[in-house]
Amino acid sequence: APGWKSLPDEPGTADELLAEMDDHDVGWSVLVQTSWSTWDNGYIADSVQRFPDRFIGHGLIDPQDPNNAEVARYWMRERGLVGFRLHPMYYPDEAILVSPRNDALWEELAAADAVIQFHMRPSDAVQVDEIAAHFPHMKLLVDHMGYPDLEAEPAAYQPIVDLASRDNVFVKISDVAGRSTHPFPHVDVHPY
């Protein structure tokens, strides 16, 4: 996130995660650089290098960095990351994903078959749709269901639903409990 340099409230190491995975018979995990971090993906990359059979790494990439295509190439080729998370919702005054200054980035990511995750709101779906159409072989993931607003009309969420027409767009339902105001099974989120 632009200018956001906070740290997690609790420590969490790759070794701790690996122990939890072993305790619960989890074979492998995708490590994703936290969005409230810096652009340095070093810890994720180091963890993937230490445990290549257990971890896959996704980093952050700065969409405002004029050299982001080269940066992405470095993290993928030299450090072993396989994808990135981008945050269009942090740039409300700009269609940052489809800005011409990021054309080289998208070409680099597509050539590497990178998997891309998006922290986004429904208003950002038009950008993801454009990328999905231009790069139909790339896997694109909508994080946290696109943060549906349960107080808004369901039509406000329609841009996320419309992404279902793209074979290469997937939605992670990781925020059901976080969005819901009801106990499990969180029926207020079911329409989304």
Task: Give residue ranges: language-model regions.
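Mid-domain alpha/beta scaffold segments of enzyme catalytic cores
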Residues: 1-104, 108-112, 163, 179, ...
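Catalytic pocket-lining loop regions of alpha/beta-barrel enzymes
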Residues: 82, 96-192
